[in-house]
Amino acid sequence: MRNKCTLAALFLSGALTAMGESTPDPQARLTALEASVKSAQSAGDNAWMLTSAALVLMMTGPGLALFYGGLVRRKNVLGTMMQSFILMAVVTVIWALVGYSLAFGGSSAFVGNLDFALLNNVGSAPNADYAGTIPQQTYMVYQLMFAIITPALISGAFAERMKFSAMLLFTTLWLLIVYLPMAHMVWGKGGFLNAFLGGKVPCFDFAGGTVVHITSGVSALVCAKYMGKRLGFPAVPMKPHSLVLSFIGACLLWVGWFGFNAGSALGASGLATSAFVATHFGAAAAALGWLAAEWFHNGKPSVLGGISGAVAGLVAITPASGFVKPFPAMFIGLCAGVV
């Protein structure tokens, strides 16, 4: 009987010891919970950023390709669309070689260095200087999509007037000389506009109003002014070939712009939601504003006016999308559409 009691006591003692060893203390459980939450947040941020990158790429092809392709004459549709398509390939190669490094490497004022050339040290580890919850490779590919669409925007200014080979040379040089330094100055660590007066006067460009739209807009204006009108215009009518293509392209641009603006929050956060809402409201108000102005001026609205207004609103709300609430966003969009 005594042996049985001894065995039972030993068994109970061992069980209690094992339970004590397997049950972590509250601090250990809290640490494990925090790690689990951080891992889930990082996974969610990464998923949203990859989705946003795909949405921004869709803005170039097929969005911008269809939008511009529908506005030119029938004989130039494929050539115009091919310009957007080829830039998806050319800019990607340049970005991998030196583009990302010149835009986001180092901390100089005007242009980056070659620390990330050939995508060296760009892997799954986050870069805390830019996005601490997603792999640097995700951030790199997201910024690549911005670099692709920016020169593609300029192509509309010289549609039907520039040879394909000349377009390739121009956009390559433009990317290296204009876009990459501007991206570094506005978004790069230590960039001139990003850290003006020691950061006391920061550059509030949430999603690319300066880097993308001002650079491409000014460059497009200079190109159009330098190259002049299309041969025969305006004596020969040059109406859009297919507004159906342009309509589909504009709709794809509208959807893709959610990745453009809300993705610039660099995570699945409340800021991304705010930018998403501001983007949509701004575009809607701009479309209505343009249509109303056109209706008043011409006596009737048009499809081209509606899609042009929506795109104008999307452009106008881009730099402010992360800073304004829905009704100010609508006001910005309305002004863009009417003006």
Predicted features and spans:
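Hydrophobic alpha-helical transmembrane bundles of multi-pass membrane proteins
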Residues: R2-T6, L10-S13, A18-V339
